[in-house]
Regions:
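Surface-exposed, charge/polar-rich loops and edge strands
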Residues: 1-411
Length: 411
């Protein structure tokens, strides 16, 4: 059964609470990064950002050590303060389309991850796993939680609401069009209740953060072989944010292709027509309205694509995914894209207004064809994870998108 653990978080002081946390580093443009750092020189970004001239000449190990030094400096300056007692942290945020997310920040068990009680739906890249493991080994903290989800459970919901009412410390702030609220749950009774109710869950599912969880597991295995490194046992868990599956918002993750692999538009349509039904939908952005329907934009027109033969009931869960159908029948068979992860002809556009963005890119002549997919449902994600299979790259774009530095897990 699932194990979660309280921990002594390192958190921004009340004075720095509003401006300390940050979005994913990669989500900032160079200009946004520059402006954010100028406006908030003591933000989490200031810890992980290295000036280009430094980044160019330092070895990875030296860059990671510099991150650790800057982190320790902010603790010394009391920008960051470590809690004195272990706690769970109930975190509530309002993000995309005024959608409210509420869950619990806790340490998730590396043992559960290794035993597949924490289930995966995405393949990881060994090089990225090892790079982040080395980073964690040097800095000894994790500031970006893995997003985990669990089946809706009224008992857990009641326990969380009770813990919120009992909390002695609550903080609220807003930044970048988002609102945030956190409750520090450090009384023993509520900690025991939350530990117990989550302990009755048979499986947790990774919604976002496959590389982070894999890297934490790699590091834990390495530390296990080094007795001198085993101080506290915090390394046996990793920073996670757990929310009920009904709260997840899964958006479409769409594809845009540079060229037609040497085919004319007519030849391309003829080849698609062998396996798929094609319906012209006009010149305005058309979004897939159901599973097994794919939207396509080509040469000024939108089309609806659907399989000529229904998916057989004995097909695997992975073969029934629209991302896999597109990969099998179009990207690989017609366009010659055998590896979506590495082929430079394919790019990805996610979320709202993505078909409009695809239309613009193709009309500008930058790309040849684009495909829109109906968002994958949580039951599909769980079915893939339960089967031990993995989805094609960029199959899901999931909210909430979690900020780094709200609670920092030190080990």
């Amino acid at each position: 059964m699932a194990e979660i653990a309280p921990f002594k978080a390192i958190r921004p002081s009340k004075e720095h609470l509003q401006n300390f946390s940050s979005k994913s580093y990669k989500s900032y443009t160079d200009e946004e990064l520059k402006n954010t750092l100028q406006k908030n020189p003591l933000s989490f970004l200031s810890i992980i950002h290295l000036k280009k001239n430094l980044n160019k000449f330092l070895k990875k190990s030296e860059r990671y050590q510099l991150v650790k030094t800057k982190f320790e400096d902010l603790i010394a300056k009391k920008v960051l303060i470590k809690d004195t007692t272990p706690a769970f942290y109930i975190y509530e945020t309002v993000q995309e389309d005024e959608h409210l997310f509420c869950g619990i920040i806790a340490g998730a068990s590396v043992k559960d991850y290794k035993n597949n009680l924490i289930k995966k739906h995405e393949a990881t890249i060994t090089k990225r796993e090892n790079t982040f493991k080395t980073y964690l080994k040097t800095v000894r903290f994790n500031a970006a939680p893995v997003l985990l989800t669990f089946p809706d459970d009224p008992i857990i919901e009641k326990a969380i609401q009770t813990a919120k009412r009992n909390a002695q410390e609550t903080n609220t702030w807003s930044n970048e069009n988002e609102t945030h609220k956190i409750w520090c749950i450090n009384n023993v009774s509520d900690i025991n209740i939350l530990t117990d109710v989550f302990g009755k869950i048979s499986s947790l599912y990774i919604a976002d953060g496959h590389h982070r969880s894999a890297s934490s597991a790699l590091l834990a295995a390495e530390i296990d072989t080094d007795i001198s490194a085993q101080k506290e046992k915090a390394y046996t868990h990793f920073l996670s944010y757990l929310i009920p599956e009904k709260q997840l918002k899964i958006f479409d993750y769409n594809r845009i292709i540079k060229n037609l692999n040497g085919l004319t538009n007519e030849e391309f349509l003829d080849k698609i027509n062998i396996m798929l039904n094609i319906q012209r939908k006009g010149t305005q952005p058309y979004y897939s309205s159901r599973k097994h329907e794919i939207s396509m934009y080509l040469s000024g027109n939108f089309y609806s694509l659907s399989l000529r033969n229904s998916i057989k009931k004995n097909e695997t869960a992975i073969s029934q995914l629209d991302t896999q159908i597109l990969q099998t029948h179009v990207l690989k068979a017609i366009l010659g894209i055998k590896n979506e992860r590495n082929d430079k002809r394919i790019s990805y556009i996610k979320g709202k207004d993505s078909m409009s963005q695809i239309k613009t890119a193709i009309d500008n002549g930058d790309h040849a064809v684009g495909f829109g997919l109906f968002p994958i449902q949580i039951k599909e994600l769980k079915s893939i994870a339960d089967s031990g299979a993995v989805m094609p790259p960029k199959s899901t774009y999931i909210y909430p998108k979690l900020r780094s530095g709200i609670t920092i897990y030190e080990f």
